[in-house]
Regions:
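Sec-dependent bacterial lipoprotein signal peptides
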Residues: 1-22
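Membrane-proximal, proline-rich intrinsically disordered regions
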Residues: 23-84, 468, 480-530
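Extracellular glycan-recognition regions
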Residues: 25-28, 111-113, 462, 467-469
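Short acidic (Asp/Glu) and glycine-rich catalytic loops that position anionic groups and cofactors
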Residues: 32-34, 339-340, 419-424
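Structured, solvent-exposed acidic/aromatic patches
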Residues: 43-47, 89-398, 432-441, 446
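Beta-strand acidic-aromatic groove motif in beta-rich domains, primarily in extracellular
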Residues: 65-75, 161, 247, 455-460
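C-terminal functional modules
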Residues: 395, 399-530
């Protein structure tokens, strides 16, 4: 695999090109190729907004043909590693043998999520916004804003402060503090939900951008449910930084007349564009990554029926087996057949959000604030049942009732004997008499399993709550900068930004409240016990 072909520029360079695009209407290299369509052609069938909307959808979780390298860097080698979902087994990349897996963050890998997100998500959003305003279609802008908030929430949760509210206003773009970014998210979601609810109420059967929407096929009710669930996710994210804001935004979600997501949001593999599942490409075609030790411990300890839905059995000897995090790999072949790849096919669709997540979010809101209908236990158990249903496995009732099984000791199946004692004793069965923290650990642990393989979200939740408890990495190459326990907290700002947007990125460092390194906590990362 050649990662060196995925090279991005800084926000300043991209912004300069963006201004040219915005003024002239030309389509630069980052825009979808419309086969030289004229401006008039693109007004037909919403092409001048729909094409940009599809491009945005394709780049929240990167999908398409020949996208595995970008996806690997931006997802699996960041949140995928840091959440414990995956471990690296490749001996060396073009950045060397030590990298994110060892908390040594290569410039190239740190640059890429930042540059790609602005190029492939924010620029199409801006083009769509301009065209939608010309066409006076606020409902289309509302849809795009929901996708934008989803994508940019992932970015800010990697870095902290980011250029956001001023995007499109100049060449050298100032950063917003993460607190301000989140407040902008809430405002945008409020507005989007209001506009879409009005549209849906007036015409429940009407669809928006149906020919370009690969997630819900233009179904407006589903988009409202998704946006409302996303708002609750983000509200809970900030609970340790601003409890009042968290509660206010959560209550808005419960006050919605439409409700929450009930089934998974899935980006389809479609027939309108070239598609290859990047998880399959990275783990099965290239063989670079395998199951992580943390999720191994929980799935095997609980004898979880979802294990074989999530991961393929090891070629040698069967069973579901992970790899300890942060190993220095000398012999990739020792792990290739003895450990488990993710269980996806070449053309498997990409999950954006599990329907089960909405139940776990509501369970936590009920636990914290007694907010919404149902009990904490009923919502927690409904989340597990929804996850089992989504994965097509049986046995949810007996699994939920199990008060004996606990996370297992990690057993290294490669022959390298990197075993480790379990880091948690949390059981599955609900215990109403338990203290708050035990209840929270139970909820977040099951949410962690249900939202697999969304490593970025799992990493964010681990930083917020400390759950599920994880194994510390084996080899830390950060020279004491990043603590192995509790682990890495963020990516440092891209080197490209220091070259191309120096004054603004230096100002952004002051917003962090600490050094620009992987050990400094984000604004919302204020849990006193983690």
């Amino acid at each position: 695999m050649k990662l060196n072909k995925y090279i991005t520029g800084g926000i300043a360079v991209m912004a300069a090109a963006m201004l040219i695009t915005s003024c002239t209407g030309e389509f630069d290299k980052w825009n979808t190729d419309h086969n030289s369509a004229t401006e008039e052609d693109m007004t037909h069938d919403n092409l001048n907004t729909g094409a940009f909307f599809a491009q945005m959808e394709h780049n929240v979780f990167i999908v398409g043909l020949d996208k595995g390298g970008a996806f690997q860097i931006e997802d699996m080698l960041t949140g995928g590693l840091f959440s414990g979902y995956f471990s690296n087994i490749k001996a060396s990349y073009d950045v060397g043998a030590l990298h994110n897996a060892h908390y040594l963050l290569p410039d190239k890998w740190v640059n890429q999520p930042f540059g790609d997100t602005y190029t492939n998500l924010m620029q199409p959003w801006l083009s769509l916004k301009i065209n939608a305003e010309k066409a006076e279609t606020p409902s289309v802008t509302a849809l795009a804003n929901v996708v934008k908030v989803l994508g940019m929430s992932r970015l800010t949760d990697m870095y902290g402060p980011i250029p956001y509210t001023r995007f499109g206003t100049g060449i050298n773009i100032a950063y917003d503090a993460q607190e301000e970014v989140y407040k902008a998210f809430f405002t945008e979601l409020d507005d989007a939900i209001s506009v879409l609810t009005e549209y849906y109420t007036a015409s429940p059967s009407s669809k928006l951008l149906a020919n370009f929407d690969y997630v819900f096929g233009g179904d407006v009710e589903s988009w409202i449910r998704f946006a409302n669930t996303l708002r609750l996710r983000l509200a809970l994210r900030v609970v340790y930084a601003d409890a009042a804001l968290a509660r206010t935004e959560a209550q808005k979600s419960f006050d919605s007349t439409i409700g929450f997501l009930e089934k998974a949001a899935i980006h389809s593999n479609g027939s309108k564009y070239s598609y290859l599942n990047p998880f399959w490409e990275v783990t099965q075609s290239w063989g670079d990554m395998r199951m992580g030790a943390t999720i191994d411990s929980y799935l095997n300890g609980y004898s979880d029926p979802r294990a074989k839905a999530f991961f393929a059995e090891a070629v040698s000897g069967g069973g579901i087996h992970g790899v300890y995090p942060g190993l220095r790999i000398n012999n990739q072949s020792a792990y290739t057949n003895s450990t488990s790849a993710i269980n996806v096919a070449r053309n498997s669709p990409m999950q954006w959000m599990s329907g089960a997540e909405s139940f776990f979010l509501r369970a936590e809101a009920k636990l914290r604030w007694d907010m919404g209908e149902g009990t904490v236990q009923s919502l927690y158990e409904s989340g597990i049942k929804a996850s089992f249903a989504e994965e097509g496995v049986s046995g949810a009732d007996s699994y939920i009732a199990d008060s004996q099984r606990v996370p297992a000791e990690f057993k290294d199946n490669s022959g390298n004997r990197r075993d480790a004692a379990a880091v948690s004793t949390i059981t599955v069965a609900w215990d109403e008499a338990a203290a708050f923290e035990e209840k929270l650990e139970r909820i977040i642990t099951q949410k962690y399993l249900a939202i697999f393989p969304d490593g970025q979200e799992a990493w964010s939740e681990y930083r917020r709550t400390g759950y599920p408890k994880q194994f510390a990495i084996d080899y830390n190459a950060s020279s004491g900068v990043v603590s192995s326990d509790p682990g890495i907290r963020r990516l440092r700002f891209p080197a490209n930004e220091y070259s191309n947007n120096a004054d603004n990125v230096r100002a952004a460092v002051t917003l962090l409240g600490g050094a620009d390194n992987g050990d400094t906590k984000l604004w919302w990362d204020k849990n006193p016990r983690h």
